[in-house]
From Swiss-Prot:
It comes from Mycoplasma pneumoniae (strain ATCC 29342 / M129 / Subtype 1). This is Large ribosomal subunit protein uL15. Residues 22-36 have a biased composition (Gly residues). Residues 1-58 are annotated as: Disordered. GO terms for biological process: translation. The keyword Ribosomal protein applies. Part of the 50S ribosomal subunit. Belongs to the universal ribosomal protein uL15 family. SUPFAM superfamilies: Ribosomal proteins L15p and L18e (SSF52080). It comes from the Bacteria. One of its GO terms (cellular component) is cytosolic large ribosomal subunit. Residues 10-21 have a biased composition (Basic residues). PANTHER family: 50S RIBOSOMAL PROTEIN L15 (PTHR12934), LARGE RIBOSOMAL SUBUNIT PROTEIN UL15M (PTHR12934:SF11). Keywords: Ribonucleoprotein, Ribosomal protein, RNA-binding, rRNA-binding.
Amino acid sequence: MELNQLKSVPKARNHKTKTLGRGHGSGLGKTSGRGQKGQKARKSGLTRPGFEGGQTPLYRRLPKFGNARKGFLKQEWVVLNLNKIAKLKLDKINRASLIEKQVISAKSQLPIKLIGHTKLEKPLHFEVHKVSKQALKAVENANGSVKLLEK
């Protein structure tokens, strides 16, 4: 079948467009079905949605609410607390080990931040993007290490 062989379904194309402004005999001459004068008879006659005839419209009378625009550039982090990490019984803590232990989602692409000041019993080795001063001090006191990754 080719494009030039296509035919419309019978009775599917009954609607014909109105021919406007072509004399009284057409039934839609002179004012083209718009009535006499007035705003709706003009070419740009319809008002915009929400227009209330010059009265302050409802969407401007009601107060703004919510902070939808506040902090949209703010950096989000996956926050790890030392006291929770100490309970996991891991030696090396990185994204792969945290996903394996289901601490973070496998889909999460957020950078990881280490916080907390819990005293650690054994040395732990971290690979994170950011670390607080207290957490760094606690890890180093336990002879552990923190490797900072780039975002």
